[in-house]
Regions:
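N-terminal presequence-like segments and the immediate start of the first folded domain
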Residues: 1-58, 62-75, 81-128
Length: 128
């Protein structure tokens, strides 16, 4: 089946991959892992996981808006963090952006992400 690609200037890909894809005629949107990059490609919040989490959620929001939805459409997120002790700050940032029901969520602690300044990455599945 063919699929469509969702792109947004708020969350530009920096390599040869897709920000989000959806099967033609379907409602499920698969969003690639978002990191704390702004629209200009600058890392936001070096050393500050809460600032990075806020930027990541803004990037997710931008992808969802480009697909015709918003954060309320997220059904599942997977969060990758590099330090377990950062989880409370990430959870606090998550609580600031979600109104009402939270999506299903998985937390995974990893040794590192693809750039040493990134402290977290979040991917998602939404129904839009």
């Amino acid at each position: 089946m063919p699929f469509s690609t969702i792109a947004t200037p708020e969350a530009k890909p920096v390599a040869n991959y897709k920000i989000a894809t959806r099967m033609e005629g379907g409602r499920l949107l698969y969003i690639s892992g978002q990191v704390a990059w702004d629209a200009a490609g600058n890392i936001v919040g070096k050393g500050d996981v809460r600032a990075q989490a806020r930027q990541v959620f803004e990037n997710l929001r931008g992808v969802l808006r480009a697909a015709g939805g918003d954060l309320a459409n997220l059904m599942k997120i997977t969060t990758y963090i590099t330090r377990l002790e950062d989880f409370p700050a990430v959870a606090q940032a998550r609580g600031e952006v979600f109104q009402g029901e939270l999506p299903a969520s998985t937390l995974i602690v990893v040794k590192s992400l693809f750039h040493p300044d990134f402290l977290l990455e979040i991917e998602g599945v939404a129904s839009v």
